[in-house]
């Protein structure tokens, strides 16, 4: 668990410390409460969120203390974020670049912003994972230029202006989550290399291959049936795959 010194500012904003080097720190403005509210406003559109709320209400009505497995408390969006974080750790460890791995705030923000732009809230975990990673792969064009092709003009979750990367915190316009990308040009290159790798791994309609890849990601030899049930299985549903040409 990371613990940072903090002090209140205004409304839901607080000041957190940012280590510049071994001898210097600076205060920067953060807004974790509003960020959580922003995330929930999008996450709650997914069907699993409604099931969780209904079950919680049922437990309260019965005054039950029975707990559900952690896996139940996940929408498909939350599970995609979880899978990406696990896979990120494995990927950067395998290439011995752990000090350059993409931060969790970027993963959560990008996934949620992409999910916000789609009407496909009924997608199960595997299809939402493929949708999000395919969308993010488009932004790899920005490695060599400042603007995406005209056909992608509506895609703005990652920007590049005057050779500077921008992933803006949705509740704090002063917070560019991609600041470190502008200090180390290898970071965005590794990010898109990782995104392409995970996209390829899960770009399959074969259920056995999908669960094999998922098992490898989580370091488990086998996934039990409950996990498979909540993750969902890959399906060939062309209308639900808007990222395909």
Residue ranges of each PLM-predicted region?
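Conserved catalytic core of two-metal-ion nucleotidyltransferases
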Residues: 1-38
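Short acidic (Asp/Glu) and glycine-rich catalytic loops that position anionic groups and cofactors
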Residues: 60-61, 107-110, 173
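Long, charge-rich alpha-helical interaction segments
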Residues: 27, 32-78, 82-83
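Generic detection of long, well-ordered alpha-helical segments
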Residues: 70-81, 101, 122, 126, ...
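Terminal (often C-terminal) interaction modules
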Residues: 137-245
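Sequence-structural signature of the catalytic-core scaffold of metal-dependent phosphohydrolases
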Residues: 6-8, 14-15, 67-71, 106
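Hydrophobic, mid-to-C-terminal alpha-helical segments
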Residues: 74, 84-144
């Amino acid at each position: 668990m990371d613990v940072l010194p903090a002090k209140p500012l205004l409304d839901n904003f607080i000041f957190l410390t940012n280590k510049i080097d071994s001898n210097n720190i600076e205060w920067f403005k953060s807004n974790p409460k509003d960020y959580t509210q922003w995330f929930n406003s999008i996450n709650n559109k997914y069907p699993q969120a409604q099931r969780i709320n209904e079950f919680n209400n049922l437990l309260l009505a019965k005054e039950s203390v029975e707990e559900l497995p952690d896996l139940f408390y996940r929408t498909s969006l939350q599970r995609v974020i979880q899978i990406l974080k696990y896979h990120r750790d494995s990927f950067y460890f395998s290439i011995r670049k752990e000090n350059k791995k993409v931060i969790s705030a970027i993963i959560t923000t990008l996934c949620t912003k992409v999910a916000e732009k789609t009407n496909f809230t009924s997608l199960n975990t595997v299809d939402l994972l493929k949708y999000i990673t395919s969308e993010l792969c488009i932004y790899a064009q920005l490695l060599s230029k400042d603007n995406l092709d005209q056909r992608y003009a509506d895609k703005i979750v990652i920007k590049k202006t005057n050779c500077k990367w921008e992933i803006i915190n949705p509740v704090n316009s002063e917070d560019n989550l991609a600041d470190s990308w502008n200090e180390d040009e290898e970071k965005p290159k590794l990010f898109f290399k990782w995104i392409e790798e995970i996209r390829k791994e899960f770009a399959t309609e074969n259920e056995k291959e999908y669960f094999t890849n998922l098992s490898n990601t989580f370091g488990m030899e086998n996934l039990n049936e409950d996990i498979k049930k909540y993750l969902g299985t890959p399906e060939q549903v062309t209308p639900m795959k808007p990222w395909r040409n």
